[in-house]
């Protein structure tokens, strides 16, 4: 029904008319950087992921004291970035580049293609309509 109405699938859980994609979320799914300001907010910059204190009063008290309101952080290593690029990239209609897959992931992609869950595109892979319904399982296979 959405396709018939002129909408296109551009992300596992999102459809839009041409040009109407949510640029904010595309930044996340494409591995971009973002600021997180406020209680419970998350941020990502140059491979460093951090998150703020969740409780609004505790966050405000830290800010009032001139303290960093971060509750924690982690540096995303190369393997983590690779896995995230698979997980987030497969959510998108543009799919993933084949070079993010290791040998086991490449074999899993060929198997998923034979199962009708992935389709090859020049230099990479895209979920089929059936694959979108099984996206988490496909990602787990491709992680190797």
Regions found by a protein language model. Give the residues of each.
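Short, amphipathic alpha-helical interaction segments positioned at domain boundaries
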Residues: 130-144
């Amino acid at each position: 029904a959405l396709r018939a109405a002129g909408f296109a699938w551009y992300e596992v859980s999102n459809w839009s008319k041409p040009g109407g994609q949510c640029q904010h979320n595309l930044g996340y799914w494409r591995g971009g950087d973002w600021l997180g300001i406020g209680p419970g907010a998350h941020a990502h910059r140059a491979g460093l992921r951090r998150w703020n204190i969740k409780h609004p009063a505790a966050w405000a008290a830290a800010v009032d004291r001139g303290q960093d309101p971060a509750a924690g952080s982690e540096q995303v290593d190369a393997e983590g970035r690779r896995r995230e690029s698979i997980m987030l990239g497969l959510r998108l209609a543009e799919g993933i580049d084949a070079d993010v897959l290791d040998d086991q992931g490449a074999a899993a992609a060929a198997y998923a293609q034979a199962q009708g869950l992935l389709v090859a595109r020049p230099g990479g892979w895209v979920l089929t309509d059936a694959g979108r319904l099984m996206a988490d399982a496909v990602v787990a296979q491709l992680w190797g």
